Amino acid sequence: MLSSILLTIFCAFLSSTGAANVADWNSLNKTLKGQLKGATPLASPCFSQVNAYEETQSEDCATAIGQQCLLDSSDPSSIKAYANVSCNQGSVPSYYIQVKSAEEVKKAFAFAARTQTAISIKNSGHDYNGRSSGAGSLSLWTRKLQELKYEPSFVPQQCGRQAGVAAITTGAGINFDQVYTFAHEKGVTYLGGSGPTVGASGGWVMTGGHGVLSRVYGLGVDRVLEFEVVTTDGVTRIANACQNQDLFWALRGGGGGTFGVILSTTTRVEPKLSIAVAFIALPANTSQQVLAEWTSLAINSTIKWAADGWGGFQGSGITLLGTPLLSLAQAESSMAELAQFAKRNGGSVAVELLSDFYDMYTKYYITNVQAGGSALFSHNWMIPSRAYANAQGRKQLQDHMDWMSSVGLNPGFLATTPYVYSGVAKQCGTFDAFGWMGL
């Protein structure tokens, strides 16, 4: 199959150690008409000692904790992060190309194959596993791919007899903030994630893609109609339900950058729709006992909330959920028990009906964007619905959440699996379990 051949080629690109010399890089820069750029860590100007290119073994940069160049994520202005510390290249690629067309990607692939240089692909850089970087690699940065187009009746290429649907095409450099604003202006709803700077056509969609509305309308991969991609053999391909079907299946779940570089993604959109929002929180000084009671209430309500279409974030002492299925009265009834509990314990409650998803996005997500950052331990636990269906399963969940709180952690879950989505299973390459998970 085409996809298995391409995967073999691309794995070689990703795992190569890199043998390119100065002459090779100069030749590539000439081929690209001067568009090859040297990459240095963002924070390097803050450091008095910059040794960005002293490391000769790329694996040392990737694994040695001292080979980094970081500011304090919680306070980027703090001088303590770089006082008496040397800045090193770390996992930042040696060189990068600001990709503006398919031709630049093809030239990069040809160079990588000839010199055995690793390729890293960066959209917005939101990759928990760091795959958008790579010591010694040639980085393909797709931010300049800024296509943004709305079509009221889109038909995928070579699907001439298929009925058209409303769709938006996003270049690989478009982020959610851009496409949400664009969709709002067109009077439609684009279904994506909650991070405004996350790319709409990158790793988010190719690893499944979930968000507030996924409960009802499916994952990002369920909504993709067509990809334009440069595969590692240097060919620009259109992948949809009518051509390159195996590649289309694989791109929807196979992970960001696995089969090539996405140039654009065309995604089905929905009409403008109202959304009920519940933002319920306990005070910051809430006791462990009250937090445990909150957790118990949430665990016992999870399946009901999922069936009502509520999607979003559920945490210890805080819930921010939205659903397009309920009226205001229905939403208040659905969340009544949690709301009453929060009020009894000095918490805040806001249950409201907003005119569309964009209003929820601008009111609750944009306003809570942090300038810095904080420590986060993420994991990929997917909790099946059956864990909530019996007392033993609920107790195990309760015990684990209570333990996390007791050791100073603030546990939270993304309640964004497609619990009530009615799409056909296994039309794409995502994990089967997405379809029957409670959380």
From Swiss-Prot:
Highest taxon of source: Eukaryota
Short name of one Pfam family: FAD_binding_4
GO MF: FAD binding; oxidoreductase activity
Signal peptide (from-to): 1-19
Keywords carried by this UniProt record: FAD, Flavoprotein, Glycoprotein, Oxidoreductase, Signal, Virulence
Domain FAD-binding PCMH-type: 89-272
PROSITE patterns xref list: FAD_PCMH
Pathway: Mycotoxin biosynthesis
InterPro entries per the UniProt record, alphabetical: FAD-bd_PCMH, FAD-bd_PCMH-like_sf, FAD-bd_PCMH_sub2, FAD-linked_Oxidoreductases_BP, Oxid_FAD_bind_N
Role summary: FAD-linked oxidoreductase; part of the gene cluster that mediates the biosynthesis of the mycotoxins phomacins, leucine-derived cytochalasans with potent actin polymerization-inhibitory activities and monocot-specific antigerminative activities. The first step in the pathway is catalyzed by the hybrid PKS-NRPS phmA, assisted by the enoyl reductase phmE, that are responsible for fusion of the leucine precursor and the polyketide backbone to produce a 2-pyrrolidone intermediate.
Family to which the UniProt record says this protein belongs: Belongs to the oxygen-dependent FAD-linked oxidoreductase family.
Protein name: FAD-linked oxidoreductase phmC
Gene of this entry: phmC
